[in-house]
Amino acid sequence: MKFRKGELFCGPGGLALGAKEAKYMHPETGEVFEFEHAWANDIDEWACETFRTNICPDRPDSVVCGDVRELDIKSLGEKFGEIDAFTFGFPCNDYSIVGEHKGMEGNYGPLYSYGVKILNEYNPLVFIAENVGGLQSANEGKAFLGILNDLASAGKYGYKLVPHLYKFEEYGVPQRRHRIIIVGIRKDQDVAFRVPEPTHKEKYRTASEALADIPEDALNHEFTRHKKKVVEMLNHIAPGGNAWSESIPEELRLNVKKVRMSQIYRRLHPDQPSYTVTGSGGGGTHGYHWEEPRALTNRERARLQTFPDDYEFIGKKEMVRKQIGMAVPPDGAKIILEAVLKTFARIEYPSINSKWDFESVSAEQVIEEVQEIM
């Protein structure tokens, strides 16, 4: 069975690569369950080019680049056909725990509603929605519950929801990246999705394992030239430390009095997963090597996100950095998407309880769990 998949907010293709690699063959019937790319949309031109280059080089027109608010949703079906699956990692800017919380009143918060419009128009069998862990605390939990209710009632049939806070380091991603992923299966389907059991809960993949043996001529592997003072400061920061380390001489310390973010000039620890790879932020937020006094290259950042070395990101260095930081780790996505395929194949797989039971979750419960995000 092939699930033809559409995607909004596709970015450079992290979810799409996970879907492309996800496959399951039924042991008794031999039937193959897999996803097939139908169409995708994103507003970022460079991300669209990256997606086209790696996911659908033979069908570049299937990536519609433009503002989702101006997208002709009906024409997608007319041009590319019906879809059985739908994925969307709706923009997280207004829900992130880094910076000001805006939630439903922000510029990006309402964009999830375009995913609901796709569900209303095409009624796919299954959808997967992704957002940052901070979504659960936005607007005192009301944003999260509102989104869940809208998704559950979408389309002709409605959807059975399984929302869960995935800690991707527990699924083989060498990075502490926590994201809410909501899997919805159409209510007329007599199958039930369960959260796949973590694969690496006892032994995380480390930063040093992930960044080993990168070829010098690897794609997107340009090094950053730092000022002498930055190099000297990094030399005084131990692995896992940051710009506020007591070991830094006074003359090399940052002249910042009010805000002290832990990510500033923070070095990776070689024996632990990386901290979260981000797509935005100014100087000092690029992620720093534990041994060499320098920022990580984009290829190193892509490795931490589990993109293969032949996955080429298109655009200038800062544009590539943004794409990588905003993506869903393909390896983590693959595990979740294969669980979806096994669900429809009616195959049992190792699973755990979801963080929230949608039928009974309340705003109060959501707020009580906020401290578990990071």
Swiss-Prot record:
Signal peptide: none annotated. The active site is at 92. Keywords: DNA-binding, Methyltransferase, Restriction system, S-adenosyl-L-methionine, Transferase. Gene3D superfamilies: DNA Methylase, subunit A, domain 2, Vaccinia Virus protein VP39. Its EC number is 2.1.1.37. The keyword Signal does not apply. It catalyses: a 2'-deoxycytidine in DNA + S-adenosyl-L-methionine = a 5-methyl-2'-deoxycytidine in DNA + S-adenosyl-L-homocysteine + H(+). Residues 3-347 form the SAM-dependent MTase C5-type domain. GO terms for biological process: DNA restriction-modification system; methylation; negative regulation of gene expression via chromosomal CpG island methylation. One of its GO terms (molecular function) is DNA binding. PANTHER family: CYTOSINE-SPECIFIC METHYLTRANSFERASE, DNA (CYTOSINE-5)-METHYLTRANSFERASE 1. Belongs to the class I-like SAM-binding methyltransferase superfamily. C5-methyltransferase family. This is Type II methyltransferase M.BbvI. The gene is bbvIM.
